[in-house]
Amino acid sequence: MNYSRRSLFKKTLIATALSALPATLLAATKQPLVIPPLIESRRGKPVFLGLESAQVKLIDDKLVEVWGFNGQYLGPTVRVRQGDFVKLNYRNNLPHSVAMNIQGLQTNSNILGGIGHSLKPQQGWSPIVPITQPAATCYYHSCSLASSAYQNYRGLAGMWIIEDDESRQAQLPNKYGVNDIPLILQDLHLNKEGSQLFRQNEPHFYGDRLFVNGQEAPFINVGRGWIRLRILNASVSRSYPLQFDDERAFLLIAKDQGFLPEAKTVKSVLVGMGERVEILVDLNEGGNVSLIVGKKRSFLDKIDLFFNDNGELTDNTVLELRPEGLLSVFNGKPSYRFSAVATLPSQILQERAFHFDAENAMINNKRFDPRRIDVNAKQGSAERWTLSATNAMGFRIQGAKFVVESRDDVATPGNELVWQDTLWFERTAKILVKFEHSASNSQPFTFGSSDLMQADKGALGLIVVQ
């Protein structure tokens, strides 16, 4: 083969390769971020959540069927206030039974839902939910036994925001969709038509394409100043080490059920499955900046990853932030200070140990059994739980809350203590769990792996609180 033919052959191979790449890797312009609709429960206004299929374009101009709420992919953002009584109306318009959970919400199990309250097709449920806890970012989603991974993956997930007087009066960005931006992260695997593909029998699920609010690598125009990002990891098995592509520092201000006592300056944050974090980034100066997963990649890195099925994301861009306009007059660092969690419970009623076997989806050498209660707790009590695992993993608990006493033998500093309901740890962790709400034998709370594939396969336990 002479040089010209060899060159032509090489160019043909590259052209063929590039034609197969996702459009977001090649597009000169990205799509603007879609902000989920906001539903507020004020003056007794009910919150309607219809579980149903929808038609959307995940890639290109190809309409595909997905699941979600109220005719859209994923769910609207529900925003409530401490002291509210929320009239919540679920309606299951899907051809499958679905159990719903609001991860992080603190209330009794008969109101929260969970695996003990499954909605059959065309069935509704209307609990009145008292909002008693402080400000938090929660997560409503499917928790159906043995089907939660698939149903979440199809789109049964949304953000639930709780505000209180303290959070509303704090000097923090609070204009929804403007400088207070919700981001729901998912990793998907799509066929050529843009439909979701799911591998049911795998121990974990890792999609090769990263979506935020149902879009791949979008952008958002924002005014100059401090921007607040509320990040929810709604992926099945993937955790996300997040940073900015220019490696700038930012402020971590909240996790799961509340604010840190004071903001923590970081350059990266790891967000496990089901976990919610809130960060502040300073966009007073400079140009565009992208929130990414892991390290910044070159275009050739992206091409290489596209042709290697190694579980990595082909594009690791979460969102590009494009600041515009004049420098904000109020460009100083936001200052706030919230009440510490943090009188840790002084009386520990009981200590328990749980070992997670990720390979076999077991807790303490047992798989989930709906007839077995794994934890009987006293309402109002605190317990110390020691968690260990064969591999790094995510943990979650329903209807209760905890503070992380230590992780991998490193004690949590007092200024980082915050109420949580999810946790990512490498080997071991000690948590102090507070049980403030009741759960019956017929409608228990659950705990276990936050990897929904693992939970569906048996890494799940039941809690009764009386």
Curated annotation (Swiss-Prot):
Tagged with keyword Cell division: yes
Main location: periplasm
GO biological process: FtsZ-dependent cytokinesis
The UniProt record lists the keyword Cell division: yes
Annotated signal sequence range: 1-28
PTM text: Predicted to be exported by the Tat system. The position of the signal peptide cleavage has not been experimentally proven.
One Pfam family named in its UniProt record: Cu-oxidase_3
Source taxonomy: Bacteria, Pseudomonadati, Pseudomonadota, Gammaproteobacteria, Pasteurellales
Superkingdom of origin: Bacteria
Subcellular location: Periplasm
Any one of the GO CC terms: cell division site
UniProt cross-references to PANTHER family, sorted A to Z: BILIRUBIN OXIDASE, CUPREDOXIN SUPERFAMILY PROTEIN
Recorded name of the encoding gene: ftsP
Function: Cell division protein that is required for growth during stress conditions. May be involved in protecting or stabilizing the divisomal assembly under conditions of stress.
Protein's UniProt name: Cell division protein FtsP
Gene Ontology MF, one: copper ion binding
Gene3D superfamilies with a match to the protein in the record: Cupredoxins - blue copper proteins
Keywords recorded for this protein, A-Z: Cell cycle, Cell division, Periplasm, Signal
Cysteines paired by S-S bonds: none
Family: Belongs to the FtsP family.
